[in-house]
Every structure is written in C-alpha cells, then in structure tokens.
Amino acid sequence: NNMVAGDFSNYDGTLHSEILWRILDIIEEHYNFEKDYRKEDAIVRRCLWESTINAFHLCGDELYKVDHSQPSGNPATAILNSIYNSIACRYVFYESGLTDFSSKISMIAYGDDNILSLRNDVKDLFDQDVITRGFARIGMTYTDEEKTGRKYNYKQLHECFFLQRGFSFNKMINIWTGPLKLRSILECFNWIKETTNEYEVIEGNARMAFAELALHDEKIFKNNTAQIKQALVNVYGQKPVSFTQTQYLMWLRDGHLTMKVPELNWA
C-alpha cells in the first residue's frame, strides 16, 4: 500500500558527472572479480567512459566538450541509466536524513523509470513529495510515472505502472499479473516490417495481443479480441486462432504461456 512510481523529465540532460564516475567504480568492482583482470583493460574502460560522459561534440565549426550526460547511441544507455537511477534515489534518501535504504525501501529501476515500496515507518518521511523535492535540489525533475503532474504521497500497487505495465491481482489464478497498457497492445497492428507474407506477421501479432489482453478484465478481452478477429477477416479473409481467457490465465499460472504463445517477447 506504500508505493511510489516515477519518471524524470529531461533525464539525460540532468545527469551529474560525479554520479556517472561513481558508476564506473561500480563497474570496475565487477571486473575485479575476473581471473583475467588487467590494469591495462581498466585504463581502456576509463578512457571509453570519459569519452562517453565527457564527449566531444562538433556543431558547425564549434567544438565543445560536455561535462555530464551521454551521447546518443551509447550501447550501455539502459544499464548506465538504471544504475544512475538507483544511486540518485539513495542519495536523495540519505540527504533526507534517513538511514539504511536497503532495509526500508524496495526499489526496481530500469532506465529513468522506477518503482519503490516504502516500509511503514518511513512512508511519511520519504514519500513522493519528499522524493520530488529532493531530486529538485540536485537539478532533476521527478514526476509520476504517467507524467500527469498529479501530486500524491504514496499509492497502492494496483494504481502503479512500470514499463507500461500495471499491477493487478487475478483472483482466478491467485497471483499478481502485469497487464500491458491497452494502447501498447493494439499498437502492434499499426505497422509491420516489409514481408512477403503479411498475414503471417499480422497473425503472430494477433496471437501476442490475445495473450496480453487476457491479463485485462473480461470485457476488455472479449471486445478487443472480437474486433481484431473481425478486422483480419475483413482484410485477409482469415480468422486467427485464439483461446479462452481462462486458458491463457491457466498457462500463465503454470508457467507455460510463453511456450504456448512464442510471439510474446517476455524476458
């Protein structure tokens, strides 16, 4: 019941070089455990890191060097941003006068998205408002995960979203599920890559969509699966195979859903 979920505005543009350099230290700690660790490799990594966070840019005939952030196309972007997110949240926590982050806060970060669960004894000391003001002091703009501007202290898990997925306790299979936002599900029909068998690709998208829709309520599942089937019949003259919502949920419960529906790209 004590959840905070958030996102940042202009995340890449507000990264601090001090924290970015600390991320390299964390990465180096990982390499220190390797049997074939060499100082020469560490020097190379440091040079690569400097060229990332203090990159040179050429704009017209002006050459300048940035003092923070990272260039577009950095292959480590997701990893770097996730670690930065985790460090920055801890910094704000400790700057708020609190101690022992790991025992009082459960946090997941991916890129500039995060979701936190607050222990009861800190929920009023480190809520959304405190976190937002803490980030503002270091020049970062923290907002709710849907960027609505809505202000709250904390909320329940079923009100949160993380990476476009919500949280819903399904009483039929007695587990929490992560329904993908409806817009994200249906967007897969808006475009496909060039192919010699368009229907085969669209049908695969439909199978994926049916499985994702099964995580929503019964009305949403039935209405949208029916519309998708009819649309494919109208355009291609063929109806894609689907199963009952109960069947999808049972497969999910038993850990077989991605085997039955391989089009799902769940990790």
Write out the residue ranges for each language-model feature.
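Active-site and adjacent loop segments of nucleotide-processing enzymes
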Residues: 64, 68-71, 75, 121-146, ...
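Conserved polymerase palm-domain catalytic core
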Residues: 2-110, 116-125, 159
